[in-house]
């Protein structure tokens, strides 16, 4: 468990760094995620950032697991932000999943998956509208 927790923590730090490079927004790891339920993994320093982010790093798998989506959705309801899962499997690219409703008006049951750069583009567009 320690290795998997370290792997997850390193992935969170990597995503925070990449998002800073793409958006100019600083992110800190939310250490309350280990003490209380329904927290995202990264906290932005920009109050206009529209997403609560859950980061997942695993050796193998395909796509965003339903449990991950349910977890970030609970955090999104608590924080009144849009949910986002950023995940990576070994030897695969980083993927981001957000509700399709973040881009088009529709039910939260539909999601859209994209790379990190596209996610950053959508974040910039949403933040510019505010």
Tell me what each language-model feature is.
Residues 1-130:
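Catalytic phosphate/metal-binding cores of nucleic-acid and nucleotide-processing enzymes, i.e., regions
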């Amino acid at each position: 468990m320690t290795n998997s927790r370290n792997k997850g923590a390193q992935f969170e730090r990597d995503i925070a760094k990449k998002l800073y490079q793409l958006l100019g927004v600083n992110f800190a790891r939310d250490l309350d995620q280990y003490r209380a339920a329904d927290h995202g993994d990264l906290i932005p320093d920009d109050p206009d950032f529209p997403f609560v982010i859950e980061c997942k790093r695993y050796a193998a798998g395909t796509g965003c697991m339903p449990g991950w989506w349910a977890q970030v959705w609970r955090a999104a309801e608590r924080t009144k932000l849009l949910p986002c899962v950023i995940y990576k499997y070994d030897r695969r690219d980083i993927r981001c999943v957000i509700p399709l409703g973040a881009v088009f008006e529709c039910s939260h049951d539909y999601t859209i998956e994209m790379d990190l750069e596209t996610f950053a583009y959508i974040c910039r567009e949403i933040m510019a509208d505010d």
